[in-house]
């Protein structure tokens, strides 16, 4: 742990931005998951399991870190209805440290660590199933090239929880999440709602200093910051589409200003292409359906722009906000082609390919992940596609425009197509029935082998796709 570099930057914002809280005492602390790859990025990979549990189960502070955890304050639009009673209701910012690989700031924050002033009558806990689901989401998305938070640790707490949306009583857990930031659009919204322009300016300066240092000398910092966040969030939205991912609850309090996916709830991956596919049973209107995710992100970014008006002007911010759709339209072909391991040809050709691809995917209902697995490398994947379970789809007339386009694209460098992963018949997927199949033996007989196997297969996929931590 000699290289571990803790910092206390968020604490410098002051008490107007957080509440100092205490972690809940748990009857048991059973280590269920520790991410050694990311622990190494922090310099804590050599902690013993006992030391790990002390910090990430009992939340004993690291030397040089926060003396007490910080429950962060924020508001947010939930399904487009404003809620001023939000905040960290079952988690807190526990520590910050410098990423030893790239020098960037990393937050360690919790989920399920107990009640806070923002719990709103809830128990402040996380179910073990919820923790397992978050591990699977973050690992899978990282392997698919999506900018995501990471699940650093999961500790089972020995508690029995009552929940209305899953069989109860159910086992409890506490998760530690890594993300470069836990500043949300809702963090800015709270300050705008309270009419605190000085604090908005302070938060903006903090965000620029630690997450967008290239903007320190910008002539109009609010506009430059907005455009940078738009770029990150639009890219994240395009990556979701390319991964076939549905977040489920795209409220403004769930959108990170660094464009990292986090706050996973009822997430799902698409079985087949369906723009109307929803992840949350309570999303009755499809507001956050697969195909409407870019629209939801654009709406949320508009709310961020509104918060910055007191520091700038509508006229100055509008050009940055107007880049949302152009940035997404540019990011989507790039994300899809990156998944296929192909070099872009140019905006018109790439847009035509995207249109042909989704027309085919909708008409054929080819399994979403299977297509990207089969055609990794474009024409270089023809032999793999020919032996695929989806091969019949590729013989159809609707596939012809896609086949022609794939022939036109050149492969990217270092595709690694001889990796053993590409000898499989089917790719590793994480559909809802697979998630349930991983969870069932844990719930029934404390059998974690299914989770360990899934994580090993995801690691193989990540290696095959050349995704670095």
How would you name each of these model-derived features?
Residues 22-24, 123-125, 223-224:
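Short, contiguous strand/loop micro-motifs
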Residues 8-14, 106-117, 204-208, 272-282, ...:
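Active-site-adjacent bridging/hinge elements
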Residues 28-31, 37-47, 58-219, 258-260, ...:
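Conserved ATP-binding subdomain of kinase catalytic cores across diverse folds
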Residues 249-250, 255:
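Hydrophobic HxD+1 residue recognition
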Residues 52, 154-155, 253:
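Residue-level "edge-of-site" marker
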Residues 131, 161-247, 258-347, 351:
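ATP-dependent phospho-/nucleotidyl transfer catalytic cores
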Residues 1-73, 279, 284-469:
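Regulatory N- and C-terminal appendages and interdomain linkers associated
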């Amino acid at each position: 742990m000699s290289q571990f570099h803790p910092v206390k930057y968020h604490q410098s914002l002051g008490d107007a931005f957080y509440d100092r809280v205490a972690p809940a005492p748990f009857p048991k602390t059973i280590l269920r998951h520790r991410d050694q790859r990311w622990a190494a990025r922090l310099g804590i990979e050599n902690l013993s399991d006992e030391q790990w549990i002390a910090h990430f189960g009992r939340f004993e502070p690291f030397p040089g870190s926060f003396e007490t955890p910080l429950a962060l304050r924020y508001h947010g639009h939930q399904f487009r209805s404003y809620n001023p009673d939000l905040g960290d209701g079952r988690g807190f910012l526990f520590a910050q440290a410098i990423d030893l690989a790239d020098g960037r700031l990393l937050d360690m924050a919790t989920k399920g660590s107990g009640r806070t002033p923002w719990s709103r009558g809830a128990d402040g806990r996380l179910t073990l199933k919820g923790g397992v689901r978050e591990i699977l989401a973050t690992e899978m998305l990282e392997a698919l090239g999506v900018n995501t938070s990471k699940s650093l640790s999961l500790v089972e707490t020995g508690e029995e929880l009552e929940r209305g949306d899953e069989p109860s009583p159910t086992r409890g857990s506490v998760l530690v999440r890594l993300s470069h930031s836990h500043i949300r659009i809702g963090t800015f919204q709270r300050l705008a709602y309270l009419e605190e322009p000085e604090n908005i300016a302070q938060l903006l300066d903090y965000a620029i200093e630690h997450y967008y240092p290239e903007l320190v000398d910008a002539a109009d910092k609010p506009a430059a910051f907005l455009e940078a966040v738009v770029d990150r969030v639009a890219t994240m939205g395009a990556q979701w589409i390319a991964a076939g991912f549905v977040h489920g609850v795209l409220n403004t309090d769930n959108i990170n200003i660094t464009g990292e996916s986090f706050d996973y709830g009822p997430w799902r991956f698409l079985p087949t292409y369906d723009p109307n596919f929803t992840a949350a049973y309570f999303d009755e209107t499809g507001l956050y359906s697969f195909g409407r995710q870019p629209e939801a992100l654009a709406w949320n970014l508009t709310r961020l722009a509104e918060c910055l008006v007191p520091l700038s002007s509508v006229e100055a911010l509008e050009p940055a906000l107007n880049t949302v759709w152009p940035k997404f339209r540019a990011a989507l072909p790039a994300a899809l082609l990156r998944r296929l391991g192909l070099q872009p040809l140019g905006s018109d050709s790439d847009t035509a390919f995207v249109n042909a691809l989704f027309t085919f995917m909708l008409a054929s209902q080819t399994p979403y992940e299977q297509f990207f697995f089969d055609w990794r490398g474009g024409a270089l994947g023809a032999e793999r596609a020919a032996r695929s379970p989806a091969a019949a789809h590729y013989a159809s007339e609707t596939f012809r425009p896609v086949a022609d386009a794939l022939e036109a694209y050149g492969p990217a460098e270092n595709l690694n197509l001889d990796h053993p992963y590409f000898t499989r018949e089917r790719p590793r997927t994480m559909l809802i029935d697979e998630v349930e199949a991983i969870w069932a033996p844990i719930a029934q007989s404390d059998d974690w082998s299914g989770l360990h196997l899934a994580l090993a297969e995801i690691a193989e996929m990540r290696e095959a796709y050349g995704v670095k931590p």
